[in-house]
């Protein structure tokens, strides 16, 4: 509260500054009104030239630029920016969040700062909440920008990279937060500079900024590749979960969305599985399957959190009510739901690239946003994004009547009252917008309305294709619209009908488009708009007389902002309107907290079920519940950010290194340092004991022989008098550098050798960098999963995560150096037009990318080389599914960028994606986010057979690691536990105790 007061202390001063800017624009408005279309368009070139001369800044140009946009909007859209919209545009340009009430024209406001900042030529991004709004705004608001000579682009999920790159090259680019974020991650997985699509992060305007930066910030963006195939455990635990009784065998805390198994439940599970101890180390993975199956049973409800269509589980976004097509929960949650619903269980995934929305948006040099509900989260915007919130006055006074909540004892009684209220309003011609919290409840209410004979439209996740059309008609006389939360954002509800929507629909029917036929579209626009305005004018007056739009909420949301967004649909631009919430003690929000106490009071007072109550106790309980949930969610978002700060610093280092390589940087000196550092690590490790007679020189020579063709004769060095570690290091470093010179000469003939080696360095370093980074992400995921347990040992989990994460990053960087050096000395290279050069490759690089040692060391045992987690590489690594034994060989490293030189590195040639990448984006709760599948084809993985099930049951024939060939560290453990070998029987600590 104190911080809120501090943040609001300067509001009056800021508003006075914004009002002064609006007055400046008004003073010069007539100067622009008198310009011809060509002269007005020519102002863009003049502004750019004045910027290029360096004598004026964007702030200096603001009044004139805003006046130009205001006039262009009047000529193209038939809309003139109000003074409060000019104020909002100035607030956005200055890097603030403009809080503007629903119906105040936020979309039109965005044209002002986007035009001004696009003059700098660095690109402007406009971020919306869904693809429909991005396409719509790019077309409609793009008319203003195109009229002024700017280019406008829009990105959507299925757009190919060349087209996507062209859209980013435009002056202004529209798209969703997920698309912008995933493009950033994909750019940092690119194989060549030609594949990059984004051109920097200059200025962004985020529409519905609270939804994107607050509601959706609990889940990071993740690109993942195929991991293991699903096992039978999902089906097994889907069978067991219904046998367990809530509050007896397990406990549920809905507020935190957690489940906890009790001793009774553990005994029942052990009995069902036929095992002695569920928490024995070999059975540890089963606990995760059990928890997910119980969450699927209790916390994920069909037709609320997801729907099942054509044998597929589709997530429903809690905040918008939309179906998130192709998206999936991560960490096995989606598979557990699929098993519960008895549909096909699809495979899990492993992280390849990730970033939180908080850290993505902090990449922008300047960030701004607009929404109707931001002041309640002003402190969070300030703390995390350094954004101020400026409440912009409404153009006309708000006259909406917000009625007090009414509370019923049961949900059935509540809906009966809702139907009666709707029927009465409909009979007198008042339009009604009903907000529900789930698909299930919207369809239940629709069924009740049909019984009552009330005509209505239903807008929920199953009918989102008609969203815009339904909402545009929701303000018509007597209209009744039942909608999930998706109705709250993006499309304006105008009393009597939306003339702009009607005009656009008419022009579309005539085959006109603002993109494809801009001249014909603009010529026909004014006539179509005026015709539509006349058609709705009379009806508008009738609806106003009936009381305006009536917004009826059937349940309170966890967040006050979501409730305010629903209320805000009524009373736009000074129109009459009314709102009311109907509640019951069975509502989700009430059940999360102490609704039982209120129910007890109603029972003692003998209040009938169909009689509502209006009590300060209930009002306080609701307010308290919402405040608690908002506080919990804020802590979740802060916690996500704290942990991602560790990854963000590491990600910045890796991505900067990749960009340097993609940019064609000369890595020669850096690779030379790699050679020296790797050799030094070998020598220091072998000579750590101090005295020469205690040095492990045999191991040193073996390791060096596997690294590069050693020229130093070992006996000569071993027998030297007065040998020191420093002398030994110097001799070997000189020898390694000379070997590198010879390697460069061997790869080319004369002047061609150097460019070939430089290209090889870039390819190898990029391939190793990508592989090691993927492995590191896997390790960091594993670390974060269990780091919370450190609190039991009185240690701060975050501090432990920071410390261990740094150590792991240092280890990864050393591994990048070592593997790069090994590959540069040993990998097979072929230049177009030459015979294939067989340069000391004893194993198949195309499979492992870990070459055998040179011939001189061919008989020495190969050192362990870190491998990619089984099936975890990008889709470019995907191969036809092979038997499990064959798949224990790790896949090849990431493809690397193509280059001007026709150089081919066996096992490292770039290949195009074949499918399998998945994208995790913000979802319905603070837990696992959904994953978007671009190509649904299966990737590599290990099918779970009967051996896996019998292993946990303790039956005869349980697979155990044998004494033969050891699996790769990241391959599935042969015991059938479902864990990686290195985390199961490959764990040295475990082997030592068995």
UniProtKB/Swiss-Prot annotation:
Residues 868-994 are annotated as: Disordered. SMART domains: SecA_DEAD, SecA_PP_bind. It catalyses: ATP + H2O + cellular proteinSide 1 = ADP + phosphate + cellular proteinSide 2. Its cofactor is Zn(2+). NCBIfam families: PRK12904.1 (NF009538), secA (TIGR00963). GO terms for biological process: intracellular protein transmembrane transport; protein import; protein targeting; protein transport by the Sec complex. Residues 868-888 have a biased composition (Low complexity). Monomer and homodimer. Part of the essential Sec protein translocation apparatus which comprises SecA, SecYEG and auxiliary proteins SecDF. Other proteins may also be involved. Zn(2+) binds at residues 973, 975, 984-985. It comes from Frankia casuarinae (strain DSM 45818 / CECT 9043 / HFP020203 / CcI3). Residues 889-900 have a biased composition (Pro residues). The keyword Metal-binding applies. May bind 1 zinc ion per subunit. ATP binds at residues 85, 103-107, 492. Belongs to the SecA family. GO terms for cellular component: cell envelope Sec protein transport complex; cytosol; plasma membrane. Part of the Sec protein translocase complex. Interacts with the SecYEG preprotein conducting channel. Has a central role in coupling the hydrolysis of ATP to the transfer of proteins into and across the cell membrane, serving as an ATP-driven molecular motor driving the stepwise translocation of polypeptide chains across the membrane. It is a peripheral membrane protein. The keyword ATP-binding applies. It is found in: Cell membrane; Cytoplasm. CDD domains: DEXDc_SecA, SF2_C_secA. Its EC number is 7.4.2.8. GO terms for molecular function: ATP binding; metal ion binding; protein-exporting ATPase activity. The lineage of its organism: Bacteria, Bacillati, Actinomycetota, Actinomycetes, Frankiales. This is Protein translocase subunit SecA.
